[in-house]
Amino acid sequence: MADIKFRPLHGRVIVRRVESEAKTAGGIIIPDTAKEKPQEGEVVAAGAGARDEAGKLVPLDVKAGDRVLFGKWSGTEVKIGGEDLLIMKESDILGIVG
């Protein structure tokens, strides 16, 4: 795990995709070309939060280290420190696993 030199702003989070299994329960090996990108990841960094209509800071529900599920088309893929990551809004996260 590389030390990320990037801090997301407002209600955004940085997520590292969690690698999916390369083999099915029946023992069939899935080639890389047939795999779908996982929709599960680990929060690497989170912004301070968003402001409500009154200007009050509303903190995020997720924090670094949380394992999360997100939509198939959520986030923007970026490369930070040689690592492929996603930047997304907290609202794109469906829930926290565990």
Swiss-Prot record:
Is Chaperone given among the entry's keywords? yes
UniProt keyword Flavoprotein, yes or no: no
Q: Which Pfam families match?
A: Cpn10
Q: Name one GO biological process term.
A: chaperone cofactor-dependent protein refolding
Q: List the CDD domains hit by this protein, alphabetically.
A: cpn10 (cd00320)
Gene Ontology terms: cellular component: cytoplasm
Q: Which keywords does this chain's UniProt record carry?
A: Chaperone, Cytoplasm
Q: InterPro entries given for it?
A: Chaperonin_GroES, Chaperonin_GroES_sf, GroES-like_sf
Primary place of residence?
A: cytoplasm
List the subcellular locations: Cytoplasm
Molecular function terms from GO: ATP binding; metal ion binding; protein folding chaperone; protein-folding chaperone binding; unfolded protein binding
* Function comment: Together with the chaperonin GroEL, plays an essential role in assisting protein folding. The GroEL-GroES system forms a nano-cage that allows encapsulation of the non-native substrate proteins and provides a physical environment optimized to promote and accelerate protein folding. GroES binds to the apical surface of the GroEL ring, thereby capping the opening of the GroEL channel.
Protein family:
Belongs to the GroES chaperonin family.
What is its quaternary makeup?
Heptamer of 7 subunits arranged in a ring. Interacts with the chaperonin GroEL.
Official protein name in the record: Co-chaperonin GroES
Q: Highest lineage ranks of the organism?
A: Bacteria, Pseudomonadati, Pseudomonadota, Alphaproteobacteria, Hyphomicrobiales
